[in-house]
Amino acid sequence: MSQTNNAGTTNTNTNQNNNRKGGNNKNYQNRNNNNQQQQGGQQQQQQQHRNKHQNQQGNQNQQGNQQGGGNQQQNKQGGHRGGKTPSNVESFPINLSQQQVQQLQAYQQQTQQNQSAQFQSNFLPPATALYTPVINYFINLYNNFKSQSHQDILVSYDSFFKSCETYYPHCALPTIENLIPILGDKFEESSFTDRFFVLLYKEIYYRYYYALVFQPNINTCVESWQNYYQIFHTLLSANSPNDVEIDLPNAWLWDLVDEFVYQYHTFAKFKLKKQDVDFLSENPEIWDTTNVIRYLYYIIKKSQIFSANTNRFESSSEDFCSHPVYKMLGYYSVISLVRVQCLLGDYTLALKTLELIDMGKKAMYTYVTACHITLYYYLGFAYLMSRKYNEATKALNTILVSVASKSKSQNFQSDHNEKKTDKMYALLTICQALYPNKIDENVSNNLKEKFGDKLLRLQKGDLSVYEELYTFAAPRCIGPVPPYISGFNVTALDPHRLQLSLFLEEVKQQSLLTTIRSYITLYSTISIQKLAGLLQIDPEDLRVKLTCYKHKLFNVLGKGETKWNNQLDIDFYIDQDMIHIDNRLYAKETDSFINSILKFEGSLTPSYNWM
């Protein structure tokens, strides 16, 4: 047993991989304490579990070894990266049902027939063994969940995911039916807390499944939807916050709502078979857009976060906003609702919804880094598609500065968040090409390092680069009507292609405007006739282009405001046939020289050692 516990401890202290599957990005030094405090009860329960299953090791151990060699391609959104299951860890076989045995055999047959690295199955084989570290972390997770200790729950939540990534890299997690017997008499089916824990574990099970499979089979999608329905129905049907005797850390609550929208987004992009279409036609409520939005609205309404006294949420114990789970779940549902609205192409409504959120530096969305990044990513994208380039630049610059500071102070290393950061740099590059504006110096340097060459091509009006960056950075937009209802051949009506075409059309309108800007910055006054000759276009066409440019110089300021303002580095007006230019270029060279002088003087300051 000591060997197993050491393995579990080592696994806990490795760096956290904060992908979409969950887990917290902070390192805690007290993780080992939880294991040591509860080791006695765990050893007794593990011994009972060993005695119960010691006669079932024959065929299933062989299946487990075959399963470990499967070539399951990981999802781009996350998933375990590595290799083989550790062989020196004590494990206990799982008594598979007949259906699970058939699934395992079918998976092995598929992997043998499809040796290509690009092969991607639509289902995972079941887990065939329970490993001792996983058992330890599961018991810790259950015990801490029952004790309602925020930090202990968060540590156990993080540790359990890491152990699952280590021991189940190419298969599904053990089902809750396999794990409940380990808890013994501790588990009470009549307890609200225990029943809700079962629902939460199932959500983790399906989240892990979606992370490893690009397009899960229809049965898994339906089961995951039904589990979310039970979770939300349990929370929404409560008559009083005192009836819900649970407390979850913010990171887990965010993962819960974020995964709900992710699975909806994934399902909306599915390429379905004929039998799946027939099934969904008879069950239209499965991952329906209206139902997804309705649940988010219901959670927001139930949480009462906007109807309560804004000065003190905890004004009454009878208010659901006084319950931390409802309060934060409602808040995260607002952000997820903004995400859904952006995916559907309703950017105006998304920006209107964001007016409900306090965007201050100490707002609640800053509690979870993934939430912070997601909010500003979709905020910047919504501003970009609404042609509010100045506001998009502000939003993207703000979050990129924040991410840079967190990466230094908190050892912020998350593949998923890093990919989102690269996408935000790409969106900022587009904004800088369409509406040049001043941004943070460090952000500007990083942008030039990542997309400097593409920015130059964008400024020359290269549409192919605009399309390339948009395809890379923009979320994959979806339609409100599922493909199986709108028809099988939906290529012409692809919402993502539609949004791309609208964006490129806007860029085409500004293709000549960039060239016009490069000329008028050289003059304080110039005649329309002369500028038309330089551009080799008709003077009347130039008047139209100048009017268009003047219109696109202006952006609505801020949220909820109707005031218009030009914050670009140049402005002009036309008086009869003369163009009068107000050139307000930032003195970037001057700032650079001043900063260099100050740094140089600082390096020359003598330091005296009086000792």
Swiss-Prot record:
One of its GO terms (biological process) is translational initiation. One of its GO terms (molecular function) is translation initiation factor activity. Residues 1-91 are annotated as: Disordered. Its main location: cytoplasm. Residues 391-588 form the PCI domain. PROSITE patterns: PCI. It is found in: Cytoplasm. GO terms for cellular component: eukaryotic 43S preinitiation complex; eukaryotic 48S preinitiation complex; eukaryotic translation initiation factor 3 complex. Residues 1-65 have a biased composition (Low complexity). Keywords: Cytoplasm, Initiation factor, Protein biosynthesis. The keyword Protein biosynthesis applies. Component of the eukaryotic translation initiation factor 3 (eIF-3) complex. Belongs to the eIF-3 subunit L family. Component of the eukaryotic translation initiation factor 3 (eIF-3) complex, which is involved in protein synthesis of a specialized repertoire of mRNAs and, together with other initiation factors, stimulates binding of mRNA and methionyl-tRNAi to the 40S ribosome. The eIF-3 complex specifically targets and initiates translation of a subset of mRNAs involved in cell proliferation. This is Eukaryotic translation initiation factor 3 subunit L. The lineage of its organism: Eukaryota, Amoebozoa, Evosea, Eumycetozoa, Dictyostelia. The gene is eif3L.
